[in-house]
């Protein structure tokens, strides 16, 4: 009879990480045989919810898949990769985290290794669960019109984002399942994988970890606050997966990413997430690969041109399908809103079906000019062509005016000046708050922004797009 640990974990084959482990729910007898606590939920139960399966129907690269034909991967596979990466970081950081907690909270029992690892894994799995069709484009074109839920931990006036929706889904839709988890996958040792008696993951911890911008909440356990930069820091378990995954599926050679070296030189100190100075080269190498992906894939000229067409039709199209309300106020209906639903309807509009002069919210119909643009998009006939480009690097403030000026002025309906900016490395003001650096032999390390000085703080790709004649 095979060891009980084989019954406790499924293996998922993945081109980036090799094998991704996923906990399976064990019957009471099997739990006892494996020396694990009784459980009535496991990661497979979360994976099989409608919210997670919906991510199969949301593409990872939105409009870029019309430019890179093999980039057909989804937010679902990315979420699995982030979960796996987060678990690796949890295992690596746990010994130093327990030691730092003992120094800062003497006499307090540290959380079990299983609880720490599984909390990070669930945060990684669910960090994108709030995404809508076309992912970040949905944020910009639809969600930005609505206010975020009120949260006393941040200033008011914030626009709604997919991270806000992820927090709502985690706490209100998936919270009961999350609370019932009792172990992380691993080598089958109960002392490492199982939660301690009385421990459970608080969904509020997971919601806190996935929040952006980062929340200031002293009431959160110290160890949760220390781990927050892994999901919103200089490097994250999110971008450590998507840079490699997107490069693989687009066929782009982004350069080496040595995630293991980065992990091996990371630890938790009383300052929080800390990188030993010899790991800086691996960090710089990774940030360089990330910048390359923005320049070659995410900000590709044809991708940006397609986005200009999408920007014209996206809001009225979602309005036709979903109505005028905020997704935050109707999560039940939002669960049914994915790219399959949108593109199925867009194909009907492109054929001239459900097209009227005065559509009403939620009636599934759109105006003729919107239908015409969708027809061009679905046939991959962008109506905009880049005729000039400028690239610039800068440290603070808006993009350099002299560089932008070379593109000339826009003309409504004929010329669009498109400015795409990526933060290539953290600014000097943010860097040390996100990641501490420990010098060799106890010596002070260079400030992080200085150590990464070969990378710009911001990189601009500006383009002048002109309307294609007859489009």
PLM feature segments, named:
Residues 1-122, 132-471:
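Histidine-centered, transition-metal-coordinating active-site segments
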